[in-house]
């Protein structure tokens, strides 16, 4: 399974940035995470580690990370890479995660549930990430007793996760639908089929840079295969709508669209100050140009990397010091200029 940041698939016009699976699990006869004190939570962590690291090669390929040992910037870097959730960070005093060396598998411990198995990769590859997450789940279940009800399925802290405990999501770049204000029209339609649309960092986040996450909202009464099949079909429909919208834009406003795209590239190559929001918006315009074949000398993987590396915590780490907002904006602009200079012809 490839790291989504270093993967750029031309299938579906490059619109699909990543596919992710999360499986919510809880240990039997133990209260949910929010009911546990620090000592009890650390026992859960130890139980999960003992169950996982008994298998061969796991200690060589995986590493435990304890959030109480990390500073805020380190935690936010993992969040910016989509490796952990905001909820896990909120539980820092009693939370941990096990991460593989390719940064594609993350087992979050003491988030909303005792265990959240997450697998993420590039492109529209829901079946692949589900297969990997299911294998991890089976390994853990060999040594852990899960909270499971014969009628309801897996028991979870949030009622919407009861059942399969499966949350599948696909991250999409939808600039044309955003520009035409068509995203809101999808909200009601998605809700009616048990799906939802969120921003770049999931629940409660904004769709900065025209990046959206489409995911299932309900797991009870539906099989894993049904959830994945429905989500994939829906994503393909949305991709088709985005492509049609782009074609219409190109027909009606060809010069204006090309001007917008090349101006964005020009600003990114020459700006002295860039805040994170402006940077993501400009990167979206350039990504649109790459996806439509208008810009031919920018690498799609470079844009994926900049999507992460231009974020506040990662910029702070790259320049190795506590930066003021203005200094961070200065260094972000410098970093983007240098990356685009190297990765353009």
UniProtKB/Swiss-Prot annotation:
Activity regulation (UniProt): Appears to be allosterically activated by the binding of pArg-containing polypeptides to the pArg-binding pocket localized in the C-terminal domain of McsB.
GO MF annotation: an example: ATP binding
Short sequence motif RDXXRA motif of the pArg binding pocket involved in allosteric regulation: positions: 328-333
Keyword Electron transport: no
Gene Ontology biological-process annotations: phosphocreatine biosynthetic process
EC number of this enzyme: 2.7.14.1
Pfam families, per the entry: ATP-gua_Ptrans
Chain coiled-coil ranges: none
Domain Phosphagen kinase C-terminal: 15-245
Reactions mediated catalytically: L-arginyl-[protein] + ATP = N(omega)-phospho-L-arginyl-[protein] + ADP + H(+)
Summary of the function given for this chain in its UniProt record: Catalyzes the specific phosphorylation of arginine residues in proteins.
Name of protein: Protein-arginine kinase
Gene source species: Clostridium kluyveri (strain ATCC 8527 / DSM 555 / NBRC 12016 / NCIMB 10680 / K1)
């Amino acid at each position: 399974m490839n790291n989504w940041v270093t993967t750029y698939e031309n299938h579906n016009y490059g619109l699909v940035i990543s596919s992710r699976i999360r499986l919510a699990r809880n240990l039997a006869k133990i209260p949910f995470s929010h009911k546990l004190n620090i000592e009890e939570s650390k026992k859960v962590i130890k139980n999960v580690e003992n169950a996982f690291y008994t298998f061969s090669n796991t200690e060589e390929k995986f590493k435990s990370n304890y959030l109480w040992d990390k500073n805020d910037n380190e935690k936010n870097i993992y969040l910016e890479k989509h490796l952990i959730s905001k909820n896990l960070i909120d539980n820092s005093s009693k939370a941990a995660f096990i991460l593989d060396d390719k940064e594609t598998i993350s087992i979050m411990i003491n988030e909303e549930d005792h265990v959240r198995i997450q697998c993420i990769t590039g492109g529209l590859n829901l079946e692949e990430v589900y297969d990997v997450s299911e294998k991890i789940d089976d390994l853990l279940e060999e040594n852990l007793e899960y909270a499971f009800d014969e009628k309801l399925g897996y028991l979870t802290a949030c009622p919407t996760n009861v059942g399969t405990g499966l949350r599948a999501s696909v991250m999409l770049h939808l600039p044309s639908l955003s520009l035409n204000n068509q995203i809101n029209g999808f909200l009601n339609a998605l809700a009616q089929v048990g799906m939802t649309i969120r921003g770049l960092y999931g629940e409660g986040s904004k769709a900065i840079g025209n990046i959206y996450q489409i995911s299932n909202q309900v797991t009870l009464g539906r099989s894993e295969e049904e959830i994945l099949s429905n989500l994939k079909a829906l994503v393909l429909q949305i991709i088709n709508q985005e492509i049609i919208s782009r074609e219409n834009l190109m027909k009606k406003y060809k010069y204006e669209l090309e001007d917008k795209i090349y101006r964005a590239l020009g600003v990114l190559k020459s700006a002295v100050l860039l805040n994170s929001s402006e940077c993501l918006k400009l990167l979206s315009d350039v990504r649109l140009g790459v996806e439509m074949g208008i810009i031919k000398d920018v690498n799609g993987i470079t844009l994926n990397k900049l999507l992460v590396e231009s974020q506040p915590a990662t910029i702070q780490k790259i320049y190795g010091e506590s930066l003021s907002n203005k200094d961070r904006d200065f260094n972000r602009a410098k970093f983007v200029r240098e990356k685009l200079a190297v990765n353009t012809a």
